[in-house]
Amino acid sequence: MTTVLTTHHHWDHAGGNQKLLELRPDLHVIGGDDRIDALKQKVTQGDQVKIGNLNILCLFTPCHTTGHICYYVTDEENGSKAVFTGDTLFLGGCGRFFEGDGAQMNEALNVKLGALPDETVST
């Protein structure tokens, strides 16, 4: 393990980052909010990260939290695409509005995530 992509600061998504960093001091923790434990690289809308053969586009999707980031990942070897949405999008709906509002959620779901190619797998 070289890198952790953290969608937001809530304990169920970032709570283990510090322990992982203790076990792997060279671990690179990426996220969009200074409140993320062990954060080493802060990203925002449009930032790009490369991990091995994966190209990652950061999508700023505030609402569940003000610093929420979704990660759109493309495998350059086989072209497969996936988006890691954290608590922005669930199979049966969207995440709760802890720090944002309906307009932000609409932007996140219908503009940013809605613009992704149909073949994108959501996780």
Question: Model-found features: residue ranges?
Answer:
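Active-site HxH/HxHxD metal-binding segment of metal-dependent hydrolases
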Residues: 1-60, 74, 81
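Catalytic core of the metallo-beta-lactamase
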Residues: 39-123
